[in-house]
Design a protein with these regions (language model features):
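Loop-to-helix entry region at the N-terminal start of transmembrane alpha-helices
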Residues: 44-59, 106-127, 166-167, 211, ...
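Short helix-to-coil transition segments within interhelical loops
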Residues: 136-142, 146-166, 192-194
């Protein structure tokens, strides 16, 4: 109940901020009297929020699909020997900062949202895959034995026993990746993607602190709201809740 209240409060605060920012020119004029244009007006904050969410959701969804699939494969007998290789490759991918990945992908696929999607997806793979591996490993062997005893096939056991029991841990990994991506997606504006990072980048390049604040506040609130939403989902998926 407390997490749900936090989610509602965060969502209301984010909505109030998005509605209030376009009308906050007098406030920022007061705070930054030295600036001729203290309010970012090039793009609507609601539009930037939707574009930001789209990049985060697409990259996170792709990473979740790949990461969970890889974890499932390496947790089966046929792919178990490849787990060390998978973990090594993921650690190498995580060692590259998103800015470096953006710089490498721009010459290959151009400016815009595409390089941001690649960079964020790569950066999300490690926490999601590790969470999926940990979640599958946490499934009690007794549950598997019971499933086999009642005649479940391997596929039925996966969908009806293993994944439901591993779901809270997997969702925790997805939550970590999504929250990180929300902050990191702001960097995508350096390569032409429309995100909430645009006011921040424009403000930094033009020494306009007001723009930086106007971009950073929605990003921070969005991260809090998404974190609370995933915590509520994680709590709902926890088996003890339904006991």
């Amino acid at each position: 109940m407390r997490r749900r209240a936090g989610l509602i409060a965060g969502a209301l605060a984010l909505a109030a901020l998005l509605l209030g920012l376009p009308r906050s020119a007098p406030l920022f004029h007061y705070w930054f009297p030295e600036l001729d244009r203290p309010l970012y007006l090039q793009d609507g904050f609601g539009e930037l929020l939707l574009a930001h969410l789209a990049i985060v959701a697409l990259s996170g969804g792709a990473a979740a699909l790949l990461g969970i699939s890889a974890a499932l494969w390496t947790s089966r007998p046929a792919g178990r020997d490849f787990r060390p290789l998978l973990e090594t490759l993921l650690s190498i991918a995580q060692s590259f900062p998103p800015v470096a990945v953006l710089a490498l992908t721009v010459p290959l696929i151009g400016f815009g949202a595409a390089p941001a999607l690649v960079a964020l997806a790569l950066y999300s793979l490690l926490p999601i895959t590790h969470a999926a591996l940990a979640g599958l490993a946490s499934v009690p062997e007794d549950a598997r034995e019971t499933a086999r005893a009642i005649g479940m096939s391997a596929r039925q056991m996966l969908w009806r026993v293993e994944l439901p029991l591993a779901a809270p841990v997997i969702v925790a990994g997805v939550r970590t990746a999504m929250v990180i991506n929300i902050g990191t997606a702001a960097l995508a504006s350096t390569v032409g993607a429309r995100t909430l990072g645009l006011p921040i980048i424009v403000g930094l390049s033009g020494f306009n602190t007001a723009y930086v604040i106007q971009g950073a506040l929605p990003v921070a609130l969005l991260a809090i709201v998404v974190d609370q939403a995933f915590q509520c989902l994680e709590e709902w998926l926890t088996p003890q809740r339904h006991a």
